[in-house]
From Swiss-Prot:
InterPro entries: Glutathione-S-Trfase_C-like, Glutathione-S-Trfase_C_sf, Glutathione_S-Trfase, Glutathione_S-Trfase_N, GST_C, GST_C_Theta, GST_N_Theta, GST_Theta. Belongs to the GST superfamily. It comes from Methylophilus leisingeri (strain DSM 6813 / VKM B-2013 / DM11). Signal peptide: none annotated. This is Dichloromethane dehalogenase. GO terms for cellular component: cytoplasm. The keyword Cytoplasm applies. Residues 91-224 form the GST C-terminal domain. Its main location: cytoplasm. Its EC number is 4.5.1.3. PANTHER family: GH16740P-RELATED, PTHR43917.
Length: 267
């Protein structure tokens, strides 16, 4: 007898939303289990030992097998359920192109998630008396720089990031931008100066399952921005990985005021 998949996640997490959308898009049955990352439950030794030594979500449990890291989970599900080859490419060249995107994305656009995290969640976690200017600046730089590459390279010849067919990079990237859009991190001028990215994001958000998995993020982040309703963070450690600022990394990049541009300070 087969056991239903257990999916441990939280809708505040971009990787969690991307995996969730993939499962919905492919009609994969699963048992949903929300891990309350506003607490420190996923940092407890028992949780780390049983599910993930990093304490991060998403996590997929398939019988006696447990797997974490969003792209790894989606690849596993693609193989297990013989999903369309379009998700990871049907030819050697397509697969290489998609892997190229995922590697680029991991150290650029994904790290740009710091723009959202340090603007919206970090003050709730660490206190509003803390100054996160450096962290926000790094995140915005990576985010805005990524917009240029999305526009000029990844969306240059197709409706989707890796061609004219929907693939997993579209889901991962869309859910990253959901956080920035919900948090009003991306100015109107940035969307307007990147029409291909703007049209692609609108096309992605027209998908039923994209709306479903992102509803929590929009609702709760906008409640905070518009009405001052904060999430009750009891933890005092980072919620999302990939947002830490390391000494010397992108050192010298500074935000240049309200025109949403960046300059590099030398010397």
């Amino acid at each position: 007898m087969s056991t239903k998949l257990r999916y441990l996640h939280h809708p505040a997490s971009q990787p969690c939303r991307a995996v969730h959308q993939f499962m919905l898009e492919n009609n994969i049955e699963f048992q949903e289990e929300i891990v309350d990352i506003t607490t420190d439950i996923n940092e407890q030794p028992e949780f780390r030992e049983r599910y993930n030594p990093t304490g991060q979500v998403p996590i997929l449990v398939d019988g006696d097998f447990t797997i974490w890291e969003s792209a790894a989970i989606v690849y596993y599900l693609s193989e297990k359920y013989d999903c369309s080859s379009s998700w990871w490419g049907s030819t050697l060249e397509e697969r290489g192109h998609i892997q190229q995107y995922m590697h680029w994305y991991a150290y650029t656009l994904r790290l740009g998630g710091g723009a959202f995290h340090w603007t919206i969640f970090a003050p709730m976690i660490y206190g509003y008396d803390k100054d996160f200017t450096v962290e926000v600046t790094k995140g915005r730089f990576l985010l805005y720089e990524s917009f240029d590459i999305l526009e000029k390279y990844w969306l240059k010849d197709g409706d989707y990031l890796c061609g004219n067919t929907l693939s997993y990079p579209d889901l991962a990237t869309c859910q990253d931008l959901v956080s920035h859009d919900a948090g009003r991190i991306i100015p109107t001028s940035m969307w307007d100066s990147h029409p291909k990215v703007k049209a692609w994001f609108a096309r992605m958000m027209d998908r039923e399952h994209a709306k479903t998995v992102s509803a929590w993020q929009y609702e709760n982040v906008r409640k905070y921005l518009d009405d001052g309703v904060k999430l009750n963070f009891q933890r005092k450690t980072a919620v999302l990985k990939g947002t830490e600022v390391y000494s010397g990394h992108n050192n010298g990049i500074i935000y240049n005021g309200d025109d949403d541009s960046f300059v590099t300070q030398h010397g």
